[in-house]
């Protein structure tokens, strides 16, 4: 049994409140490796529902290890069967990747959108955004192969760097695609930028963008203007973060300038320790 399998996804499902003003409720299902994305997605869906606008979100999600539990896996399959949007990220555990593929493949055509961020090739093939799929990108196979290779390396190579490499490579491929496919590919790139940002606000705008482009009908799209979908907020790949600072710092000099000019604290006592933590980027943003 996995350490995660005592948690039922049904206990954290996000649904619109009763007597809401939503004209359409969109069902989204996700599978992720990192729990911080689970938290951000939950808050993003709640934020959309609390606006009580034309669109509501019914969100259910799983950490990938939770799918080892038979009941969770059956719940996942039932959720997928009625989903509008499916999202997955960092699915690199082979047996669990196969479970995801087996659950989602029969319903891929029914999904309005399926967005798969770097995962094993068979999972990446579940991507579906309009006319775009990863299979259409001639270089996608080698890029994904590189991602898997780096994931397995023991020299400390950053898997995050590999994700960013994929993001940076895709624009150069777009010029070889027909216009319609290029537009959908750009949506995938934009989705990736929202995802790498990882904040509640970024993921809220990600869900709204996908809903607007692929789920809701034309007569409702004008009403989405009240949501004011924002561009992705980006963060540096490497940096220094302080909980009291207004932003992340990209250099030690920037951080020291801010620290030395703070007026919200007393001059430092020489005996006061400074504590630094080394964290993955996704744990901060």
Please tell me what each predicted stretch does:
Residues 1-285:
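An N-terminal assembly and electron-transfer interface module characteristic of large anaerobic redox
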């Amino acid at each position: 049994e996995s350490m995660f399998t005592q948690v039922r996804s049904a206990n954290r499902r996000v649904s619109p409140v009763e007597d809401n003003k939503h004209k359409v409720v969109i069902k989204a299902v996700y599978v992720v490796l990192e729990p911080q994305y689970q938290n951000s997605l939950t808050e993003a869906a709640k934020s959309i529902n609390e606006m009580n606008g034309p669109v509501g979100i019914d969100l259910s999600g799983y950490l990938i290890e939770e799918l080892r539990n038979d009941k969770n896996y059956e719940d996942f399959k039932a959720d997928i069967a009625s989903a509008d949007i499916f999202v997955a990220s960092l699915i690199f555990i082979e047996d669990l990747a196969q479970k995801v593929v087996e659950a989602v493949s029969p319903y891929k055509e029914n999904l309005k959108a399926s967005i798969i961020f770097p995962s094993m090739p068979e999972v990446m093939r579940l991507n579906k955004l309009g006319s775009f799929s990863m299979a259409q990108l001639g270089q996608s196979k080698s890029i994904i192969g590189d991602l898997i290779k780096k994931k397995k390396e023991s020299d400390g190579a950053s898997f995050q760097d590999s994700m960013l490499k994929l993001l940076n490579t895709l624009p150069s491929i777009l010029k070889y695609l027909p216009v319609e496919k290029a537009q959908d590919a750009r949506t995938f790139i934009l989705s990736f930028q929202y995802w790498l940002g990882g904040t509640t606000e970024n993921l809220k705008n990600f869900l709204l963008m996908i809903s607007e482009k692929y789920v809701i009908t034309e007569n409702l799209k004008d009403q989405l203007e009240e949501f004011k979908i924002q561009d992705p907020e980006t963060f540096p790949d490497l940096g220094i973060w302080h909980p009291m600072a207004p932003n992340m710092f990209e250099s030690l000099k920037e951080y020291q300038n801010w620290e030395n000019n703070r007026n919200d604290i007393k001059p430092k006592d020489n005996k006061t320790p400074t504590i630094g933590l080394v964290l993955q980027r996704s744990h901060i943003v």
